[in-house]
Amino acid sequence: MKALRNYLDKIKPNFEEGGKLHAFRSVFDGFETFLFVPNSTSKTGVHIHDAIDSKRIMSMVVIALIPALLFGMYNVGYQHFLAVGQEAGFFEKFIYGFLAVLPKIIVSYVVGLGIEFVVAQWKNEEIQEGFLVSGLLIPMIVPVECPLWILAVATAFSVIFAKEVFGGTGMNIFNPALITRAFLFFAYPTKMSGDAVWVSTDSIFGIGGGQVVDGFTGATMLGQAATAAPGASELINVNGTPATMWDMVVGLIPGSIGETSVIAIALGAIILLWTGVASWKTMFSVFAGGIAVSYTHLRAHETLMNL
């Protein structure tokens, strides 16, 4: 790291006032502060004094997302080989999922960070760090079969209209990742819902592929529950076999890339709580609000609830 620090110090004058690369100063500053703690100090009063900066916080959130991301990659491969009825080892399933998910991560970061680079240059400001998290969240909350060009359009829309128009990181009133999903759902509903978007059945670089098994269904567990006939109590996997509660807890079910595993998501939550990045009160409030609304919905048919 010392050698890298010395190299950055050597080329830094080129990006300062009067340097031949001054036009790209915001890009250099963003890269430098991502690698090292900035040596700048506040010019006015601040609310909190701490040794950690925003980039370190965002980096910790990215680390917390890794368990769900890695499991999501494995599950993409698992669902694929289950659908085509082929035997495959852990490594082959993971590689298939990795190759299916990686392009979405690349598109998300290239489009989102590209827009942020342009805005930073235009406003002559340092590149903001918020998209470090959003760029990873966006591909994790979409189906594996979501086309790359649609993902690029949705990412651009969310970065511009849900973030930059409000002033950037810390000033936006909407979450860019959630706006991306909302945009996709309303603009391209057939790419975000139904039975055909959650499981990849194509071959990737010669890995996998083939005819799907008889009884194949790509519906999610919630989708099956919503459309089940009255009295039906059994949910099924993509190959037609009954799904167990353990499958749902572990996350071996169809769904968005990073949403299926309760265990992986809980591990990420533990990381955030342990590092002090997240508050247990905020997490508890989310579940409390969800339970309260669900209870209200269950009682909505009662006459007294409609007075």
Q: Residue ranges of each PLM-predicted region?
A:
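Conserved small/polar residues in nucleotide/adenosyl-binding loops
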Residues: 296-303
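Hydrophobic alpha-helical transmembrane segments
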Residues: 59-66, 103, 107, 258-272
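Structural signature of hydrophobic alpha-helical transmembrane segments
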Residues: 97-108, 146-152, 258
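Long hydrophobic alpha-helical segments that form multi-pass transmembrane helix bundles
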Residues: 170-265
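N-terminal signal-anchor module of multipass membrane proteins
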Residues: 2-101, 105
